[in-house]
From Swiss-Prot:
Pfam families: ACAS_N, AMP-binding, AMP-binding_C. This is Acetyl-coenzyme A synthetase 2. Belongs to the ATP-dependent AMP-binding enzyme family. Keywords: ATP-binding, Ligase, Nucleotide-binding. ATP binds at residues 402-404, 426-431, 517, 532, 543. The keyword Nucleotide-binding applies. It comes from Candida albicans (strain SC5314 / ATCC MYA-2876). CoA binds at residues 207-210, 326, 540, 603. GO terms for cellular component: cytosol.
Length: 671
């Protein structure tokens, strides 16, 4: 039986009305949907769980091109940590993303590149992309890069980043992309951990109207990177003050001019690594997550096609960077595997104004838009006046990624961006999952604002009691979200540390993959992601989800964002401390009155036991580059350990920390 607390959480979810897909969505579909209705989805899902060989085998042959057919669809277990898919098969990721489309339709747009300054924007066709990828691959091959090697990529979100990744994959090597915003120290750590033989970068980056000396950061990092032998430098700004290190650094344009526009791709085994990607530092030391080639490619293609309802005529705009998994899977691999154009955006949603996203959608008639709630909150704060200037009628599917989208942001997204005419896909997944785990299929699964809905094909989701470790059967329940069997795009290991992989994902609940997140499953079987399991506070025996308390706080129209942490309390075990940032125009609000109002809001929404001990009003919350709130920072400050914050240089807004320390000190009488 669920506890009263669990029942209350799920009861709140059950009260949300189902939203059917608007008729305009179907009117805008260029072809019939891939799945007719939710019943067909459920039938396909059941087959994917009960007969994964019979389900995924034919799909792998349909969506991917093979140099040598596979003989075994699925092998290994979660418990043993030896998952493998499509054994015996051979293929190449670059061929699947580029060549086959270039041969069939060379003039079709592949990369629609929107630069920070719109005047620098351009389009690469599939034919162009094949030539550019082959030339860069030729350079790398001449440097001795081969199957089994790893090459680092430290580039902004531009065409060259995509070309570099595909060129590395063309040779059967693995790419390790580092977000072009990390410090020299972070670059060094990632390059050394992956033993990268080469690095691909640029002179400078342009983002939000600002210029960043990318090459300088790389030079600082490479002082302590003994494995890097060569560096390829793209001239983004052509700044004459950027200098090369003789014998190590070479300019992109000079070197690629030496090689022909076609280089045959290298076949690799299905389980050979395609890439490494380091998880963000919000959970401690970054882990180099390793994704295999065939399984990852199938996951990317399958989820892009079915969850977003992608057709050959569509144009996907994923507002995510290739420095993160969203950019890998849904800006690069997913759309290119399906042969559709992908919009690559170098800039920010606020430059030159808050209408930039919508200007891009209108200009290219994008059919799909995929973005993080962090950006949506920023745009909502700026107001709707920038949205109404643009024609967004080409849009059919709106996606959300990176964190659960709160019902109020969902409603705003639906009304002002989608005009109540689009399907919204609130997607739940992870760097480690490679592709979507839980999401409502566009045009198929009705929505519940705030819920990620049903698991995707092959994802046998389960809720685990965190105390007993036993699976919770049935609906109307809450627990730790786990997965009962492996799926094609699941990460295979942590680079050079399989023990860490097992301890992190497989050993907490043997026989299950541990997501690290809590979730509720309502009476319809819809999943509601409740945030990280470690983002739970225990007040007087009540286990409270911080995400639930945060949702209650942002119901107040004055609050833009909220983050909740637990601190030690002699009486209750833990106490709730809430940090809130206000919307523009509310900074002069009576802070004491607002604090009391917010405490009352939580008491009313959840119960007296969940009421924050203190509400601290701040200018901004500390975030990672991918937009996730760093609650670790807030916990340290709240525990009077501000002198033990560690490295905060990888935050997107490190200046926020000083304001948080000051606000906490002012309220608790400490400096």
């Amino acid at each position: 039986m669920p506890t009263e607390q669990t029942h209350n959480v799920v009861h709140e979810a059950n009260g949300v009305k189902l939203r059917e897909t608007p008729k305009e969505f179907f009117e805008r579909q260029p072809n019939k949907g891939h799945i007719h209705d939710v019943n067909q989805y459920k039938q396909m899902y059941e087959q994917s769980i009960k007969d994964p060989q019979g389900f995924f085998g034919p799909l792998a042959k349909e969506l991917l091109s093979w140099d040598h057919d596979f003989h075994t669809v699925k092998s290994g277990t979660l418990k043993n940590g030896d998952a493998a898919w499509f054994l015996g098969g051979e293929l190449n990721a670059s061929y699947n993303c580029v060549d086959r489309h270039a041969f069939a339709n060379p003039d079709k747009p592949a990369l629609i590149c929107e630069a920070d300054d719109e005047k620098d924007s351009h389009i690469l066709t599939y034919g162009d992309l094949l030539r550019e990828v082959s030339k860069v691959a030729g350079v790398l091959q001449s440097w001795g890069i081969k199957k089994g090697d790893t090459v680092a990529v430290y580039l902004p979100m531009n065409a060259q980043a995509i070309i570099a990744m595909l060129a590395i994959a063309r040779l059967g090597a693995a790419h390790s992309v580092i977000f072009a915003g990390f410090s020299a120290g972070s670059i060094k750590d990632r390059v050394n951990d992956a033993s990268c033989k080469a690095l691909i970068t640029c002179d400078e980056g342009k983002r939000g109207g600002r210029t960043t000396n990318i090459k300088k950061l790389c030079d600082e990092a490479l002082v302590d990177c003994p494995t890097v032998e060569k560096v390829l430098v793209y001239k983004r700004t052509n700044n004459p003050e950027i200098h090369l290190t003789e014998g190590r650094d070479y300019y992109w344009d000079v070197e690629t001019a030496k090689f022909p526009g076609y280089l045959p791709p290298v076949s690799v085994n299905s389980e050979d690594p395609l890439f490494l990607l380091y998880t963000s530092g919000s959970t401690g030391t970054p882990k180099g997550v390793v994704h295999s080639t065939a399984g990852y490619l199938l996951g990317a293609a399958l989820s892009t096609k079915y969850i977003f309802d992608i057709h050959p005529e569509d144009i996907l705009f994923t507002a995510g960077d290739v420095g993160w998994i969203t950019g890998h899977t849904y800006a690069l691999y997913g759309p290119l595997l399906l042969g559709v154009p992908t919009i690559i955006f170098e800039g920010t949603p606020a430059y030159p104004d808050y209408g930039r996203f919508w200007q891009i959608v209108e200009k290219h008639k994008a059919t799909h838009f995929y973005v993080a709630p962090t950006a949506l909150r920023l745009l909502r704060k700026a107001g709707e006046q920038e949205i109404v200037k643009y024609d967004l009628s080409s849009l059919r599917t709106l996606g959300s990624v990176g964190e659960p989208i709160s019902p109020d942001i969902w409603e705003w997204y639906n009304e002002f961006v989608g005009k109540n005419q689009c399907h919204i896909s609130d997607t739940y997944w992870q760097t480690e999952s490679g592709s979507h785990l839980i999401a409502p299929l566009a045009g198929v699964v009705p929505n519940k604002p705030g819920s990620a809905s049903y698991p995707f094909f092959g994802i046998d989701a389960a809720l685990i009691d965190p105390v007993t470790g036993v699976e919770i059967e049935g609906n109307d329940a809450e627990g730790v979200l786990a997965i009962k069997d492996h799926w094609p795009s699941m990460a295979r290991t942590v680079y050079k540390n399989h023990t860490k992989y097992m301890d992190t994902y497989m050993n907490p609940y043997p026989g299950y993959y541990f997501t690290g997140d809590g979730a509720a499953r309502d009476h319809d079987g819809y999943y509601w992601i409740r945030g990280r399991v470690d983002d739970v506070v225990n007040v007087s025996g009540h286990r409270l989800s911080t995400a639930e308390i945060e949702a209650a706080l942002i119901e107040d129209k004055k609050v833009s964002e909220a983050a909740v942490v637990g601190i030690h309390d002699d009486i209750t075990g833990q106490a709730v401390i809430a940090y809130v940032a206000l919307k523009e125009g509310n900074s002069d609000e009576d802070s004491e009155g607002l604090r009391k109002e917010l405490v009352l809001q939580v008491r009313k929404t959840i119960g007296p036991f969940a009421a924050p001990k203190s509400v601290i009003i701040v200018q901004d919350l500390p975030k990672t580059r991918s937009g996730k709130i760093m609650r670790r920072i807030l916990r340290k400050v709240s525990s009077n350990e501000a002198d033990q914050l560690g490295d905060i240089s990888t935050l997107s807004n490190p200046q926020s920390v000083e304001g948080i320390i000051s606000a906490f000190g002012a309220q608790f009488g400490k400096k």
